[in-house]
Curated annotation (Swiss-Prot):
Keywords carried by this UniProt record: Bacteriochlorophyll, Chlorophyll, Chlorosome, Chromophore, Photosynthesis
Keyword NAD: no
Organism: Prosthecochloris vibrioformis (Chlorobium vibrioforme)
Protein name listed in UniProt: Chlorosome protein C
Domain of life of the source: Bacteria
Cellular component GO terms, alphabetical: chlorosome
Alphabetical list of Pfam families matching this protein: Chlorosome_CsmC
Subcellular location: Chlorosome
UniProt gene name: csmC
């Protein structure tokens, strides 16, 4: 194993239990974000070879039904990009890349929010644990 991995492992083991949980939660969210963004970039490259305009992009990929109908962040972002684009001659790949950047911003903010929530949760767990130790320590 590499030195950097060994250092990361040691640092992780030195963390409090609640800090470990926070770290793992943030890692899961960021990994999910990377998968979503990577998937959209690949899809954008593939669709660009098939469709050249906003209308044909939506028709060829079924994005309007698949993502737009879900009411999710990705669907809403793609809908907004498609509606607000003035120059229909822009390539489908450019539209996808704009959508990907917007999704990255949203998920990045979500990661920060989870980090903040994790810190609050960590503090709350520490306070409860401290109270529990004080209560059980009295006889």
């Amino acid at each position: 194993m590499s030195e950097s991995y060994q250092k990361l492992r040691k640092d992780f083991k030195d963390l409090d239990f609640t800090d470990r949980l926070t770290f793992l939660a943030e890692s899961v969210l960021l990994t999910g974000q990377s998968a979503i963004v990577g998937g959209l970039e690949v899809a954008g490259s593939v669709v660009e070879t098939v469709a050249g305009t906003v209308g044909s992009l939506v028709d060829a990929s079924g994005i309007g039904n698949m993502l737009g109908g879900s009411g999710g962040v990705v669907g809403e972002t793609i809908d907004r990009v498609a509606i607000t684009v003035k120059d229909v001659s822009r390539s489908a790949g450019d539209l996808y890349n704009d959508a990907v950047r917007n999704v990255e911003n949203v998920t990045g903010n979500a990661a920060k929010a989870v980090g903040d929530a994790g810190s609050s949760a960590s503090d709350a767990v520490k306070n409860i644990a401290g109270s529990f130790q004080k209560t059980t320590g009295k006889k």
